[in-house]
Amino acid sequence: MAYDIKDDSIAAKMERIYPKRMWLKKGMPFNVAQLDAERKRITSVLTDNGYFHFHKDFISFTADSVKGEKLVNIALHLDKFRPANSTCDTLHTSYTIGSVNFTGGNNGKLPLRKGTLAENTWIEEGKPFCSTDLKRTYNSFGKLQAIRY
């Protein structure tokens, strides 16, 4: 399997995080569903490591079969970010949580104590954005019936 990652910061992060989790292995039968599952896994790894705007459409594969052989060479391509209304590609931005604040509704009062809210918040200041932590926070808040978000 070959990798064509056009963003050096993601390439470095992938080398540290991802090789331990590789699902696609040399000698596996070619399967489009497995390639799509790999795209989703890589997307999950990156959105849990600061890349808020990353989605699976940045990842594509090319498959090259050798005539007479029963082998397929796979290349994974990870493209740069293209902002809306732009023709220029840029590097993907990695986001870090700056601060976590709780604000009340129309009257400005919080429906619960800050301690209760903090105990149910998985997002932490100074850590990279993590979509799993965001979902866990939403789920925890959903169980607190006094909260609407």
Sequence positions of predicted segments:
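Interaction-mediating elements
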Residues: 1-144, 148-149
